[in-house]
UniProtKB/Swiss-Prot annotation:
It comes from Mus musculus. Residues 121-146 are annotated as: Disordered. Pfam families: Suppressor_APC. InterPro entries: Suppressor_APCD_1/2. Residues 137-146 have a biased composition (Pro residues). This is Suppressor APC domain-containing protein 1.
Length: 146
């Protein structure tokens, strides 16, 4: 079990001990079966937690990467605006279409994952409270029109 660091991945791995007690000699022993199922669920939850930590770290790196590409694109846009009609003379005016396609695929995958989770959460809230939640998630706004 890991304890999260301030605003980031886990800093310290907390030790723990697993104690296995014999519950009987039969595989059909209900206590042994329940324990085995519990242990399997705990392991699955630990794997999910590890994957979530990895995803969070990737998102942090991804956010920095996206911010850098956004700044570069804005700079290129300003340069292109400054060139005016002479933009054909600039060799750096070419866009990177394959990169754009990959970015759009990543955005679509993230949107799909987040939208499915928000839908599940909202259904749970609606069922438990009886009212519909219609609030947009916080965060930066979409693309800016020029």
């Amino acid at each position: 079990m890991e304890s999260p660091g301030p605003g980031g991945p886990p800093l310290v791995q907390a030790p723990y001990t697993v104690l296995l007690l014999p519950l009987g000699t039969s595989r059909q022993d209900p206590g042994a079966q329940n324990f085995f199922l519990w242990l399997q669920m705990m392991q699955a939850l630990e794997r999910e937690q590890d994957a979530l930590w990895q995803g969070l770290e990737l998102l942090e790196h991804g956010q920095a990467w996206f911010a850098d590409r956004l700044r570069e694109t804005q700079q290129r846009q300003l340069q292109l605006g400054a060139l005016g009609e002479d933009f054909l003379m600039d060799l750096h005016s070419e866009t990177d279409a394959p990169l754009l396609t990959r970015i759009q695929k990543v955005n679509a995958c993230l949107h799909s994952l987040i939208h499915k989770e928000l839908s599940k959460h909202r259904k749970g809230v609606t069922q438990s409270t009886g009212e519909v939640v219609s609030q947009a998630p916080p965060g930066p706004k979409g693309p800016t029109l020029v």
